[in-house]
Amino acid sequence: MADADAQRQAEEDANLQLPPYPHPPPFYLKFTTENKDRLDEIKKEDGIDTASDGGKSAQLSTEQILALPTELRYLIPPEPPADTEEFNVFGTINQLKDRDTFNGTMEYISQALAKLLPDWKYEQLYPTTDASNSASSTLDRQRYLFRFLRSILVAYIELLGIVAINPTDELKDDKLKDILTMVTNMHALINEYRPHQARETLISEMERQVEKKKMEIQGVRKMKERVGEVLEGFGREIPSEKAEDRTEEAAVTSEEERKRDAQRQMWQAMDEMLSQ
């Protein structure tokens, strides 16, 4: 008996067809016109004007929501999460409102180098960009990047001179802090190019797709011309009505040969088109 049940269960599992996409949650069936009208009536009884709040249910208190029938509670959207509420994505803790990841990175660097470079803090050495500024007053990031690069080279040469004279000199740490500050400022400026990089990447990808489509269209046109030439050749090979003096057997034989030749030419043309 157990074997028969197991076999029947195995057959049912084998015949079970899973949908390609998951089904929607069952409570979507509660979103009906009747339930919405019932909810509007309850709101009016509680003194909530649905016309003024656009039909939103945020003004219902917790007690009022719990007093509603179960099928009407689904029509009330939950409160949006707070900006500081954390959630996990692929093992990384995130917030609804983006964190200042750059300042967090600078704090991490400061803590990691606390023993080597105590009291080092990130200091922004370039003016802050303002979205309200005009295009003429936009920050010239390239100029500041070159400035930082030259300053890093000069500071590095000075650091070599200090270390060559006295490796334990305290000025060494000051130069290292200056170099680290300028490097982090360059890093911050380079990060501001990310939107530009994303835009240029999108433009490049779209141009590549346009060129690909143009090549495909050109290939289709070449195939069309080739097929037209083959069909035109077939038309020239159709026997004329002046061949009535031929015997019936010779006509049948020549017609079969022409069909074979036409088929061979067609296959040859298809091979040429597919090989392109």
Curated annotation (Swiss-Prot):
Its main location: nucleus. It comes from the Eukaryota. One of its GO terms (cellular component) is core mediator complex. GO terms for molecular function: transcription coregulator activity. Disulfide bonds: none annotated. InterPro entries: Med7/Med21-like, Mediatior_Med7, Mediatior_Med7_sf. Residues 1-11, 234-263 have a biased composition (Basic and acidic residues). The keyword Nucleus applies. GO terms for biological process: regulation of transcription by RNA polymerase II. Gene3D superfamilies: 6.10.140.1520, 6.10.140.200. Keywords: Activator, Nucleus, Transcription, Transcription regulation. Residues 1-27, 234-276 are annotated as: Disordered. It is found in: Nucleus. Belongs to the Mediator complex subunit 7 family. Component of the Mediator complex, a coactivator involved in the regulated transcription of nearly all RNA polymerase II-dependent genes. Mediator functions as a bridge to convey information from gene-specific regulatory proteins to the basal RNA polymerase II transcription machinery. Mediator is recruited to promoters by direct interactions with regulatory proteins and serves as a scaffold for the assembly of a functional preinitiation complex with RNA polymerase II and the general transcription factors. Component of the Mediator complex. This is Mediator of RNA polymerase II transcription subunit 7. The gene is MED7.
